[in-house]
Amino acid sequence: MTKALYVGSFDPITNGHLDIIKRAAKIFDELTVVVAINTNKSALFTPQERVNLITQVTRDLENVACKSVTGLTAETFTQEKADVLVRGVRNGEDLNFEIQVAGMNQYLNQEVETVFIPANSKWEFTSSSLIKEVVKMGGSIKGLVPETVEVLLKSRLK
């Protein structure tokens, strides 16, 4: 059995993230979505809130689980007995950054193998940060995030 980890801040989960989750769940026997604490970002939702949202929107995917962690992804990889790390990439800028991250993860833990899944063109422009900004400015995010996330975002940011 092949176990994959999909690590991110997911603050909040978007339909782009969800698309990567669904596609990775078809490729790997087990997929654990890992909510990580990104010290470079100011989070709107607590790690537990993000886990709850992800669990709710992936409940129909039998081979998907979700948890939050602190610490390095390379350490989580070993703790979870993972075989591969999944990363979604929207564009060349993402890929350049993700290649650096993959290199560092492999430096820290030679067992870490990273697989890049290109974003569906439908989601190339979406990011959690951009979606939060649109909500703050009163714009519509309909269709960019799951409905439960949209409702929670609007109540949190207005």
UniProtKB/Swiss-Prot annotation:
InterPro entries for this protein: Cyt_trans-like (IPR004821), PPAT (IPR001980), Rossmann-like_a/b/a_fold (IPR014729)
Localization terms from the record: Cytoplasm
Biological process, per Gene Ontology: coenzyme A biosynthetic process
Keywords per UniProt: ATP-binding, Coenzyme A biosynthesis, Cytoplasm, Magnesium, Nucleotide-binding, Nucleotidyltransferase, Transferase
GO MF annotation: an example: pantetheine-phosphate adenylyltransferase activity
UniProt-listed Enzyme Commission number(s): 2.7.7.3
Pathway membership: Cofactor biosynthesis; coenzyme A biosynthesis; CoA from (R)-pantothenate: step 4/5
Catalyzed reaction equations: (R)-4'-phosphopantetheine + ATP + H(+) = 3'-dephospho-CoA + diphosphate
Principal place of residence: cytoplasm
Covalent S-S links between cysteines: none
Cellular component terms (Gene Ontology): cytoplasm
Pfam families: CTP_transf_like
Obligatory cofactor(s): Mg(2+)
Marked site (Transition state stabilizer) residue numbers: 17
Subunit structure: Homohexamer.
HAMAP family: PPAT_bact (MF_00151)
Similarity comment: Belongs to the bacterial CoaD family.
Protein purpose: Reversibly transfers an adenylyl group from ATP to 4'-phosphopantetheine, yielding dephospho-CoA (dPCoA) and pyrophosphate.
Name this protein carries in UniProt: Phosphopantetheine adenylyltransferase
Organism, scientific name: Pediococcus pentosaceus (strain ATCC 25745 / CCUG 21536 / LMG 10740 / 183-1w)
Gene field: coaD
